[in-house]
Amino acid sequence: MSKKLYIKTYGCQMNVYDSVKMQDLLYPFGYEPTENIEDADVIILITCHIREKAAEKTYSELGRIKKLQDTRKKQGLNSAIIVVAGCVAQAEGEEIFSRAPYVDIVVGPQSYYNLPELISKVVRHEKHLIDLDFVEEAKFDNLPEQLYPQGASSFISVQEGCDKFCTFCVVPYTRGAEFSRNVEQVYREALKVVSSGAKEITLLGQNVNAYHGKGPDDKIFTLADLLGHLAQIPNLERLRYMTSHPIDMTDDLIKLHGTEPKLMPFLHLPVQSGSNKILKAMNRKHDRDYYFDIINRLRETRPDIVLSSDFIVGFPGETDEDFEDTLDLVRRVKYGQCYSFKYSPRPGTPGATRTDQVPEHIKSERLTILQQELTAQQLAFNESCVGSIMKVLFDRNGKFDDQIIGKTPYMQSVYIQNPNKSLLGKITDVKITKAASNSLTGEVI
């Protein structure tokens, strides 16, 4: 009889990728995924530490799991093995056992390949096991090839960690230094996902455009080299990459946007602030003019490119004038979509130690103003697509039985009626008939 594995994933696409790899890793040991936590023999939380709210979700979920464990005990059933993985695990380590002593395993992002052994030890009644080693090569060398198809759109992790040390960010401390997978590993995984039906691959990294992996004859491949190499794979129709840092937008990568048709005309390029003073305080290593120059060069190379970004409001020392600079940058760039957040002090980062923290109510006011501007831009872009014909990759079911959802080259979600789901996994021409701020509606032509 198979054992059941339940994984709940918080945070970034890298965590989503890691969750798939955990399924592949544990399947040979008899664990099959389940969407019902009550059936699980092993429960894994893949956690995010980028903001305080995200980290606290871990403990809220652990509290709910504790109630489930208590119910099982009353019914005379075995307890599930509880694993906390991801960046909260790496950042807080033993503290997790203090706050949630019923947790069995704490494992960091670079040590997932040890999960079968750790779980086996818990089965043998060992408790409070922890593995937070930072050996990036070991992770990629030991993770299995794909067993579970990811569908029409797949993630592949090609780079982990970050050397930039932005003063608001925990990633260098939870994911470690920048490390790139070798080209052969990535190419082999790409062939595997395409052979199982993927039409689109998104290359992932905390700082993906800093990729510098070894290729044949020990040649160092840039991200542009890697994308060009993968573009040669038959039946692979779309390529994307995220998340990028502005200072690593190299000439060859910008040029590739104009020469490689499989590279989608959409780029997520976080800037975080439009104020030079705040950019310097964040240690972003560039100013707003540098960012504008990249945007201009991208648009000259690929006129139809659409941009996305991340913004943080209320970083320590941010004045009304600094915030106005951010609004000015947003209005000048004109984004297709964006993500915006209030600054959240993270323990161990330089930003958290500053004495000029912005009051919470001011952060909230600024976030509301910024999000209104960003939502208006996103709606305007979506409305500009009404009446056009777009190629849509349908990759998931909708809320209703006769509905499926796909995405345009610009990462917009498109809803259509397709009762027999015959278009799932396919790229199809769709006429856009309606726009909302977060989605489009269309008809197959």
Curated annotation (Swiss-Prot):
Domain annotation MTTase N-terminal: ranges: 3-124
Organism: Rickettsia felis (strain ATCC VR-1525 / URRWXCal2)
Protein name: tRNA-2-methylthio-N(6)-dimethylallyladenosine synthase
Domain TRAM: 383-445
EC number: 2.8.4.3
Gene Ontology cellular-component annotations: cytosol
Keywords: 4Fe-4S, Cytoplasm, Iron, Iron-sulfur, Metal-binding, S-adenosyl-L-methionine, Transferase, tRNA processing
Quaternary state and interactors: Monomer.
UniProt gene name: miaB
Cofactor: how bound: Binds 2 [4Fe-4S] clusters. One cluster is coordinated with 3 cysteines and an exchangeable S-adenosyl-L-methionine.
